[in-house]
């Protein structure tokens, strides 16, 4: 059979993408396996050997950890991005980072196709493909889990396991695996299996990135986090003097400290982009600390009315990231506006990390809008209390008129 061409497969080494690699070869494609190192615990050399053994023409293992932090996580920190008030977007942020490098490899290798193992029911298929089409409009995407010849053949995990046995694909898991996991620097997500019943509590052994808060140390770690333009540039542990200043090391250290204290666990039901609700359990240790610390320094340094507008932009940014529109013109516009809002977000925040919680202890900034003398109950300063009378009268006018009308309506 003549080759249909080369396809760059986003390969994880797990059951799905290992089977997809072999299946793509069956369909006549030359497969280039691409594995992104985005901070997950993985034996990358073992994954390389496995992909080559399964017939990959080439294997690329790309370390994108630093760019993931600086180009994706930092904008999320600046925006205080939360999807549906709770989700810090760990998976959502990783997908455009992974897919961007996948497209670069495809262009470099002259491959017309890219492929992924995302299911036809989830968000990741959208995130991967919108990135690919944005960066390489001519690219063709092979999405096996949306192709009848694939999903009719493999109706579930058991069928994949049987296919793996037939083709000598070494798989470390069994059909009884109780949930699926996805890990990167930002977080670990757990879903599917026994977690699909939203009433089922997460088993104690599920969590791998954070300590059980009840078993966490009995004394807190106090951290000082320094921000410039809304981005963390330095973290210092007040207890032992440990300091980190480079983006990747800083973020990894916060993961370590927060994980030790059980910070960053959530169990939620969220609305997927395609319309269904899903249950997800997430551990986001460093991201949780930075979310709270950044909120604090931002409130300390940013004008009230600017912050109201910025909060709306942050909500829109979270929605765009979650739904896969990282490379859209509207997301570029929102990111630019948020970055503008962060120009004066500078200073240091002290936080206590303890038993699953992050407590703000204090903050300082050379650009603070906080005026201690003006706000003091003991010093009058430039503020005339009598001026508040007119302020209240003007603001009460609308309320008086509204309730005057309501009284007339009620009387009728």
From Swiss-Prot:
ATP binds at residues 10-18, 36, 115-123. Its EC number is 6.3.4.5. It is an enzyme of class 6 (ligase). Widely expressed. Pathway: Amino-acid biosynthesis; L-arginine biosynthesis; L-arginine from L-ornithine and carbamoyl phosphate: step 2/3; Nitrogen metabolism; urea cycle; (N(omega)-L-arginino)succinate from L-aspartate and L-citrulline: step 1/1. GO terms for molecular function: amino acid binding; argininosuccinate synthase activity; ATP binding; identical protein binding; toxic substance binding. It catalyses: L-citrulline + L-aspartate + ATP = 2-(N(omega)-L-arginino)succinate + AMP + diphosphate + H(+). L-citrulline binds at residues 87, 92, 123, 127, 180, 189, 270, 282. CDD domains: ASS. It is found in: Cytoplasm, Cytosol. Acetylated by CLOCK in a circadian manner which negatively regulates its enzyme activity. Deacetylated by histone deacetylases. InterPro entries: Arginosuc_syn_C, Arginosuc_syn_N, Arginosuc_synth, Arginosuc_synth_CS, Arginosuc_synth_type_1_subfam, AS_cat/multimer_dom_body, Rossmann-like_a/b/a_fold. Keywords: Acetylation, Amino-acid biosynthesis, Arginine biosynthesis, ATP-binding, Cytoplasm, Ligase, Nucleotide-binding, Phosphoprotein, Urea cycle. PROSITE patterns: ARGININOSUCCIN_SYN_1 (PS00564), ARGININOSUCCIN_SYN_2 (PS00565). SUPFAM superfamilies: Adenine nucleotide alpha hydrolases-like, Argininosuccinate synthetase, C-terminal domain. The keyword Cytoplasm applies. This is Argininosuccinate synthase. It comes from Mus musculus.
């Amino acid at each position: 059979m003549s080759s249909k061409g080369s396809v760059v497969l986003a390969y994880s080494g797990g059951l799905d993408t290992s089977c997809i690699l072999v299946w793509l070869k069956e369909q006549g494609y030359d497969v280039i396996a691409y594995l992104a190192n985005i901070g997950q615990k993985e034996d990358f050399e073992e994954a390389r050997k496995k992909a080559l053994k399964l017939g990959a023409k080439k294997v690329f293992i790309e370390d994108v950890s630093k760019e993931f932090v600086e180009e994706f996580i930092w904008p999320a920190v600046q925006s205080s991005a939360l999807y549906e008030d709770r989700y810090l977007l760990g998976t959502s942020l990783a997908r455009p980072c992974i897919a961007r490098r996948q497209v670069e490899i495809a262009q470099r290798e002259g491959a017309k196709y890219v492929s992924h193992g995302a299911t036809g029911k989830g968000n990741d298929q959208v995130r991967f493909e919108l990135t690919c089409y944005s960066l390489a409009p001519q690219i063709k995407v092979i999405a096996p889990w949306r192709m009848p010849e694939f999903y009719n053949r493999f109706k579930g995990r058991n069928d994949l396991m049987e296919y793996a046995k037939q083709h000598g694909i070494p798989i470390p898991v069994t059909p009884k695996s109780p949930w699926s996991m996805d890990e990167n620097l930002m977080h670990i997500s757990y879903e599917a299996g026994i977690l699909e019943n939203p009433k089922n509590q997460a088993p104690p052994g599920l969590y791998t990135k954070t300590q059980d808060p009840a078993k966490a140390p009995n004394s807190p770690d106090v951290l000082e986090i320094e921000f410039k333009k809304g981005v963390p540039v330095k973290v210092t542990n007040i207890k032992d003097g440990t300091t980190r200043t480079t983006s990747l090391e800083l973020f990894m250290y916060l993961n370590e400290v927060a994980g030790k204290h059980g910070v960053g666990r959530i169990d939620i039901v969220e609305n997927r982009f395609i319309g269904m609700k899903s249950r997800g359990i997430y551990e986001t240790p460093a991201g949780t600390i930075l979310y709270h610390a950044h909120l604090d320094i931002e409130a300390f340094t940013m004008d009230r009315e600017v912050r109201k507008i910025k909060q709306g932009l942050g909500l829109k940014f979270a929605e765009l990231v979650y739904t896969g529109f990282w490379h859209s013109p509207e997301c570029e516009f929102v990111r630019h506006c948020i970055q503008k809002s962060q120009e004066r977000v500078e200073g240091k925040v002290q936080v206590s990390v303890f038993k699953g919680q992050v407590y703000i202890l204090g903050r300082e900034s050379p650009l603070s809008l906080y005026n201690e003398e003006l706000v003091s109950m003991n010093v009058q300063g430039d503020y005339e209390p009598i001026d508040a009378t007119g302020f209240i009268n003007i603001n009460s006018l609308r309320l008086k008129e509204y309730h005057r009308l309501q009284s007339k309506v009620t009387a009728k």
